[in-house]
Amino acid sequence: MRLVACLVFLASFALVCQGQVYKGGYTRPIPRPPPFVRPLPGGPIGPYNGCPISCRGISFSQARSCCSRLGRCCHVGKGYSG
């Protein structure tokens, strides 16, 4: 009897959740960019290692490369760490 009551509860809960999802137009989670690399606009490139002197003016892929190769990672509003 408990099993039947539990199954009825779960089935009704699933139907309610499906209705909420459909009403809200929810499709899937929104992907977020990695928190360690967020390039900011404007800035020079360092002469020897190919990584910028500051986090400004570099592409996302260049910032990720500098972070993985040299441990110099850009943080929003803080510049480099490491």
Swiss-Prot record:
Compartments in which it is found: Cytoplasmic granule
Gene Ontology terms, MF aspect: chitin binding
Family, per entry: Belongs to the penaeidin family.
Superkingdom field: Eukaryota
InterPro entries: Penaeidin
Keyword Protease: no
UniProt organism field: Penaeus vannamei
Stated name of the protein: Penaeidin-3f
